[in-house]
Amino acid sequence: MGLQACLLGLFALILSGKCSYSPEPDQRRTLPPGWVSLGRADPEEELSLTFALRQQNVERLSELVQAVSDPSSPQYGKYLTLENVADLVRPSPLTLHTVQKWLLAAGAQKCHSVITQDFLTCWLSIRQAELLLPGAEFHHYVGGPTETHVVRSPHPYQLPQALAPHVDFVGGLHRFPPTSSLRQRPEPQVTGTVGLHLGVTPSVIRKRYNLTSQDVGSGTSNNSQACAQFLEQYFHDSDLAQFMRLFGGNFAHQASVARVVGQQGRGRAGIEASLDVQYLMSAGANISTWVYSSPGRHEGQEPFLQWLMLLSNESALPHVHTVSYGDDEDSLSSAYIQRVNTELMKAAARGLTLLFASGDSGAGCWSVSGRHQFRPTFPASSPYVTTVGGTSFQEPFLITNEIVDYISGGGFSNVFPRPSYQEEAVTKFLSSSPHLPPSSYFNASGRAYPDVAALSDGYWVVSNRVPIPWVSGTSASTPVFGGILSLINEHRILSGRPPLGFLNPRLYQQHGAGLFDVTRGCHESCLDEEVEGQGFCSGPGWDPVTGWGTPNFPALLKTLLNP
């Protein structure tokens, strides 16, 4: 059957399922641990589905990202506006017409788009959705630490073949909400009392990374930062105020968030949400802070997609965004990963600095055809984000040199090839490291991460008005590094320079200047006889455990202030 035949009678094709294809044949549909099915959804129940429409000029977008992010380029710092990006990538008129005609034929009338017109979110009944997407069968599920309810399909969906050039994927069918990987570790044993700290607080962060009481935002510049939250949990203003009363006495700070984008619920505060806000606002002290709250409260929504669509619908955004979200690369479809990567590319073109946590499972581990391999995570493995690993103090109660935090995520992507900006650093690591795992465990030619690191072990957090000690994870290191970059943006903006934007090309060109090199320790991996739980190990220069290292603020400011 030819394309013209497929285009004729779309509604009949929806009903018959003929002349169809699967956009996400490789999407994992196994039920994540901790989730249970509650049975079929009511046919008249409504859900929302997000249609990712095919974009134009993605290769040109990639070239522009390189041009505006490379300090040696005459285009460096000349970022695109949202309108520029929209003009470049907006779906073709044929794509817009074809998809809209198909949706209208199926009775989908409650739809809204974004400025770039490349996402379309529609509300449909379950009955309509199952007719629209042959093969889909929607069930209720409950799971996660907060007993979250979602509607998902355990079966693959199909689209009419006529839509193959026009739709990348449909969101809201398979992917389950992320879960927090934060750990609360046992308190280490104290062996002395001189010069001790009793856990990581803002004063410990500021001392270790050489931030003085004067290293805060001016409160007068057009500078802002943001964190994004997807775990159906919230921060509380009262917790932030108490945290600053307890730990913010030695530096100027803001005790409230400037703006919440999305839904801010009234339930109990979440530790991860509290951690993100409290340490972004204490490292990037006295800088206007936004919180993107995309909890995915409606059962059909994918909260990470919601956040990406918010970025595509706001012309004026904070310069630095920190995100503590990730999934195993192998759990996601190729169509989804490639499209999300393009969204991250769009943000880089606009001069946004996106920082993602590297994860808290070391190198990870899974079995492929009976053999163990390391397990990279995404979006940490995207070549268009700066990924943050984790460290611990060499002496747990002393502000000393840092070593690897054994949970710090890192490794090599199985999806994205190594970007040119890190070719020299990664090649040097692979040729000089004395402790490389067997080559069968990782893809040595893939995008390597993390890029940088910060302390990730033993934080104090205030949640539901209770100070909680020994919270650990790269969800802690990421907002700390983000706040420090916001302070550098403050100096750049006040001196008439553009914000840092996508950092990696510059970071790798400067070979770790302005960072403390972390050279001791290894992270965890597969518990088998061959690697015995050990992944990669840190060493001089860049490594796939702590990247280039942790921030030394005065030196990093000097390195990144010009041009």
UniProtKB/Swiss-Prot annotation:
Enzyme class: hydrolase
Cofactor(s) listed: Ca(2+)
Effect of residue 422 to H: In CLN2; displays no residual enzyme activity; altered intracellular trafficking;
Annotated keywords: Autocatalytic cleavage, Calcium, Disease variant, Disulfide bond, Epilepsy, Glycoprotein, Hydrolase, Lysosome, Metal-binding, Neurodegeneration, Neuronal ceroid lipofuscinosis, Protease, Serine protease, Signal, Spinocerebellar ataxia, Zymogen
InterPro entries associated with the record: Peptidase_S8/S53_dom, Peptidase_S8/S53_dom_sf, S53_propep, Sedolisin_dom, Tripeptidyl-peptidase_I
Chief place of localization: other
Consequence recorded when altering residue 277 to M: In CLN2; displays no residual enzyme activity; altered intracellular trafficking; demonstrates enhanced processing in response to folding improvement treatment
Record's catalysed reaction(s): Release of an N-terminal tripeptide from a polypeptide, but also has endopeptidase activity
Cofactor remark: Binds 1 Ca(2+) ion per subunit.
Disulfide feature: 111-122, 365-526, 522-537
Signal sequence bounds: 1-19
Tissue specificity field: Detected in all tissues examined with highest levels in heart and placenta and relatively similar levels in other tissues.
Source superkingdom: Eukaryota
Binding site for Ca(2+): 517-518, 539, 541, 543
Residue ranges of domain Peptidase S53 in the record: 199-563
Reported regulation of activity: Inhibited by diisopropyl fluorophosphate (DFP).
Subcellular location: Lysosome; Melanosome
Effect of residue 475 to L: In CLN2; displays no residual enzyme activity; effectively transported to the lysosome
Catalytic center residues: 272, 276, 475
One GO term (biological process): lipid metabolic process
Positions of the propeptide removed during maturation: 20-195
An MF annotation (GO) of this entry: tripeptidyl-peptidase activity
Subunit field text: Monomer. Interacts with CLN5. Interacts with CLN3.
Disease: Ceroid lipofuscinosis, neuronal, 2: A form of neuronal ceroid lipofuscinosis. Neuronal ceroid lipofuscinoses are progressive neurodegenerative, lysosomal storage diseases characterized by intracellular accumulation of autofluorescent liposomal material, and clinically by seizures, dementia, visual loss, and/or cerebral atrophy. The lipopigment pattern seen most often in CLN2 consists of curvilinear profiles. Spinocerebellar ataxia, autosomal recessive, 7: A form of spinocerebellar ataxia, a clinically and genetically heterogeneous group of cerebellar disorders. Patients show progressive incoordination of gait and often poor coordination of hands, speech and eye movements, due to degeneration of the cerebellum with variable involvement of the brainstem and spinal cord. SCAR7 patients show difficulty walking and writing, dysarthria, limb ataxia, and cerebellar atrophy.
Protein's name according to its UniProt entry: Tripeptidyl-peptidase 1
